[in-house]
Amino acid sequence: MASTIKEALSVVSEDQSLFECAYGTPHLAKTEMTASSSSDYGQTSKMSPRVPQQDWLSQPPARVTIKMECNPSQVNGSRNSPDECSVAKGGKMVGSPDTVGMNYGSYMEEKHMPPPNMTTNERRVIVPADPTLWSTDHVRQWLEWAVKEYGLPDVNILLFQNIDGKELCKMTKDDFQRLTPSYNADILLSHLHYLRETPLPHLTSDDVDKALQNSPRLMHARNTGGAAFIFPNTSVYPEATQRITTRPDLPYEPPRRSAWTGHGHPTPQSKAAQPSPSTVPKTEDQRPQLDPYQILGPTSSRLANPGSGQIQLWQFLLELLSDSSNSSCITWEGTNGEFKMTDPDEVARRWGERKSKPNMNYDKLSRALRYYYDKNIMTKVHGKRYAYKFDFHGIAQALQPHPPESSLYKYPSDLPYMGSYHAHPQKMNFVAPHPPALPVTSSSFFAAPNPYWNSPTGGIYPNTRLPTSHMPSHLGTYY
């Protein structure tokens, strides 16, 4: 048996026509071939020890081709079949150097369906770039691609069979959740929004991964082993960073690099050029990072200007952060207001020079920063050394002009008792017990002296007699 297989291998390797039709020159006619022992599938065929060469070489090359739609396990059903030497997993030819750099695009133009044993998932889905122009078939293709690409469970595509692109774009998250679980709705809706907003007509799998970065269930945390996901939305609003936890029953599967395109031309790809999951960089690193100095620079410069007053410590830090040349000692950490002192001693030294305090160090500076915690100007970032975070809302409130605190009564006339107080020169007598009601006449409020003041026992000094001419007549009109 071993000698029979060796002789069959030698015969097949000498006949190069077996390897020219499937991936060779395209001018050869495309035909189909079944295994020579297909009728005896599962049985051991009997062959003579010597295989006559003329039985193999006499066949025309155009009829000796390999049908890639065949399952290799079926072709290899007979151990003595020479076809097992020419078909390998993934559609590659053993012993043919021309198949290593095969053109994937030309192959897909000839094959409408991928072989069932393809593990690289290289079938391309081509739909219009604008989802509003999709037909019901396009919607179905998009759903089938998303289910296979991201392993979405429990997606009933039949529920979407009467939905075209326009209706799909009008659907809200609640509409998606009525047709599929919430986990799938997040992914599908996030991808659909990206397809609607992107200006590029050519979409690749990298673009899809970037689109799904905004999905809270697909943002994989670097330090949590897939248990926590990060939802950064810091492109415009610095304070919108959030952390949420996924459901434990839905494990995260890294997106595969398949080919999702919209009117795109096929790109040459092959299994040899397919990067392994260990070498694929994380999509977070591929996303273009926003420059915090461009986003926070104008705000830092405006807030760091104290005007005519003395500069405060938090304004001095913003002044350093507004210039990227100071990144050697202090730098922004993202666009949410977080910063880090890479050289805290240098920051303290510069602050000491500004305030004419040569003994300034980081310990004194950090104690001064604690004063701003209660003012909601900045906070300490826990778990990070020399890291702080500005609260721009608190700074805006702290800079609001406060009205000056006025006294309850600006003038003596505002006091309710000052009218009667000024009517009598004896200032000590207005606190006497049980003062009688003041007489009110039509001629003058202070027309006549009150008999209370002339009473020898009514005042504080009972033995003091007051003259009757004590009240001048002009006091009533003066006050």
Curated annotation (Swiss-Prot):
Residue ranges of coiled coil: none
Ranges annotated as biased composition (Polar residues): 34-47, 267-281
Sequence position, cross-link Glycyl lysine isopeptide (Lys-Gly) (interchain with G-Cter in SUMO2): 282
GO MF annotation: an example: RNA polymerase II cis-regulatory region sequence-specific DNA binding
DNA-binding stretch(es), residue numbering of this chain: 311-391
Site features described as Breakpoint for translocation to form ELF4-ERG oncogene, chain residue numbers: 462-463
Subcellular location(s) of the protein: Nucleus; Cytoplasm
The protein's name in its UniProt record: Transcriptional regulator ERG
Native organism: Homo sapiens
Organism ancestry: Eukaryota, Metazoa, Chordata, Craniata, Vertebrata
